[in-house]
Amino acid sequence: MGSMTRAESLAILEAAFDFGICHFDVAPMYGYGQAEGVLGEFVARHPGRITVTTKYGIPPAKRDGAISIARAIARPVVRAIPGLKRGLTSVASRATNAGKAAFTASEARESLDRSLSELKTGCIDVWLLHDATLADLHDEALLRLMEESVAAGKIRTFGVGSGRSAIEEIAAVRPQFLPVAQFAWSVLDTAVPVTNSFRIHHRALTENFRGLRRQLLEDRARCSRWSGLVGSDLSDPRSLAALMLKAALLENPTGILLFSSKSSQHIRDNVAVADDATLEAPARRLYELLQAEVSPANSHQVRAAG
């Protein structure tokens, strides 16, 4: 969100809420360690109307002196968690990486208690292990803590937010940690197999949009051919972004799709994409073309082009 003040951050959250967004994703490290506190202030304004995801696994960066909130606070989502509240949400841009946690029960308990305090709530809706890998899940007491925290009403559910390959390894060996799985997915990725986990996807656009747009602009013949097949001008950045976002929604129709924005107009536009059924057919066709004509190896090149 650039160099935003606390007031500006709260204002963009209020704008997102006005558009129907009522689930917010955050982490202790976001906003140089201040994002949970700001989100907590916002949540307190709307008691019983907002749900929250936060995480344990990457500590906040340690900075001396006063630090203004210079990043987004939470990622907008365009689907809601079944059984919680229907809605869309906003999400925080990351601060600098402050290292990785030990993924022990004692450390996790301290992190959870801090998050509950910062968020000014007695219960966190979704609590994720942040960037955890299979090798990190060595402490059986950590799983017990998460299960006991659900039973105690401190969290509603839990899971892992990590890379897709790490999620797949955990699902194969330690599925008990994965009631919820959060990972990146865009039209450049293969379809996700059916899983028992509730899925949260992110990065449908960002560098994936920039890379694909650049490739299409450099290959005018393909851009023209695909535009005709899709029925939309793919040289238009708004059209391309809308179809990429819609395809990501269609890939995870019962889950959550996260996106970040510092612009209330962009948030409004993304909400409109979620509600526009006429985009479904062209979005599916775009995804089919990418999967048929861009190999997995080349998809990495498309991302790199961004």
Predicted regions: what they are:
Residues M1-A7, R94-R109:
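Active-site mouth loops of central-metabolism enzymes
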Residues M1-A74, A151, A305:
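N-terminal binding-site loop/beta-alpha segment at the start of enzyme catalytic domains
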Residues E8-A15, P28-Y32, D113, D125, ...:
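Beta/alpha (TIM)-barrel catalytic core signal, keyed to glycine-rich beta->alpha loops juxtaposed to Asp/Glu
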Residues I12, F103-L116:
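Short, well-ordered amphipathic alpha-helical segments that serve as non-catalytic structural scaffolds
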Residues G20, K120, K154:
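Conserved functional loop/turn residues at catalytic and ligand-binding sites
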Residues E36-G48, S111-E118, P193-N196:
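Short amphipathic alpha-helices and their capping/turn segments at secondary-structure boundaries
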Residues T51-K55, V77-G87, I200-E207:
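Non-cysteine beta-strand/loop elements that form the S-adenosyl-L-methionine
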Residues P60-A98:
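Alpha-helical membrane-targeting segments
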